[in-house]
Amino acid sequence: GIGYHETSNLDEVWVIGMRNPYRISLSNNNLWIADVGSNIQDEINFVSTDSNNLDLGFPYIEGNLSHGPFTDDLKFPNKNYKKAILAERIGGLIGGHPINFGGYKMYTYGVMNGDLFGIKLLDNGIVKTKIIYDDKTFESENALLSIERSRNGIYLLTLNGTVVKIDNSW
């Protein structure tokens, strides 16, 4: 991630001000970026690839918290989660073979306690979160470790090695 705050005139620079972007997913000319926070909040950022020079604020902003001066061009993240023991976010994916509820493609992500969520963008730009999977096999002693997509579906990997397929057929 680029944590400095300098203006760039390069068209290929879409986003600055991220701490540790570790999972990027591209869908319909948009980027979904999972970004690990420093010690308080993680972020899931939605960025249109039509924009460039977008500043997500790090190190001045972490999630929705300000650590420094605001500027007019900072953009707050779409969704963020407070860090806690066994509650870090496991980010996510969209596109290709998306989980699809009500006709919406969803960015799928989880937290290490096993809860799985989706974020969808509606036509009016509103972002909503919906729990899309809840299974008691993903309790804290069997935490969710990874979400991966293949041509056959979306899979979850747990701490004890269990692989669970999820898709839009349920």
Question: Which residues make up each language-model segment?
Answer:
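Beta-propeller domain segments
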Residues: 1-131, 142, 149
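Short loop/turn motifs that cap or connect beta-strands within the blades
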Residues: 132-136
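Blade-level signature of beta-propeller repeat domains, shared across WD40, Kelch, NHL, RCC1
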Residues: 146-170
